[in-house]
């Protein structure tokens, strides 16, 4: 009885493993067909665009360079002569192409772009806020001194509570 249940479990296990492999290969081949359909429609659209516009225009890059190696996992035709070259090869060949005409950084706007000009406005607004909130302490200490004392209190280097600053 134990031998029969063990063999039935092994039979179920092998069946499930083989069915997953077949499903995986079928899904990979279906994905390859869908990818090829997308690439063909893109090529057709690009060809029609070239025929319609006689003037010189910027040509969009082909989608073939973005095709993953994962899509050819179970494809025997491509795997016959291929070898594993590692992640460096995949990164260099399937990365985005560099467009050197575009700057690699974003243009900064507002107060971040010119901090020297806006620094005067920022200090004036903070001084107004402090004068409104600390009318009793504004006569005793200059603003820089109050900030320094508050920072020292928050760091814990002065042996007094922060409310005394």
Curated annotation (Swiss-Prot):
Protein family: Belongs to the melanin-concentrating hormone family.
Cellular compartments annotated: Secreted
InterPro entries (alphabetical): Prepro-melanin_conc_hormone (IPR005456)
Protein name according to UniProt: Pro-MCH
Keyword Secreted: yes
Pfam families, A to Z: Pro-MCH (PF05824)
Role noted for this protein: MCH may act as a neurotransmitter or neuromodulator in a broad array of neuronal functions directed toward the regulation of goal-directed behavior, such as food intake, and general arousal.
Origin organism lineage: Eukaryota, Metazoa, Chordata, Craniata, Vertebrata
Disordered: region residues: 68-88
Domain of life: Eukaryota
GO terms of biological process kind: chemical synaptic transmission; feeding behavior; negative regulation of synaptic transmission, dopaminergic; neuropeptide signaling pathway
Keyword Secreted: yes
Disulfide feature: 153-162
Keywords associated with the record: Amidation, Cleavage on pair of basic residues, Disulfide bond, Hormone, Neuropeptide, Secreted, Signal
Predominant localisation class: secreted
Signal peptide as annotated in the record: 1-21
Gene Ontology molecular function: melanin-concentrating hormone activity; type 1 melanin-concentrating hormone receptor binding
Chain positions found as Isoleucine amide: 143
Post-translational modification comment from the UniProt entry: Pro-MCH is processed differentially in the brain and in peripheral organs producing two neuropeptides; NEI and MCH. A third peptide, NGE, may also be produced. Preferential processing in neurons by prohormone convertase 2 (PC2) generates NEI. MCH is generated in neurons of the lateral hypothalmic area by several prohormone convertases including PC1/3, PC2 and PC5/6.
Recorded GO CC terms: extracellular region; nucleus; synapse
Gene name, Swiss-Prot/TrEMBL: PMCH
Organism (species): Canis lupus familiaris
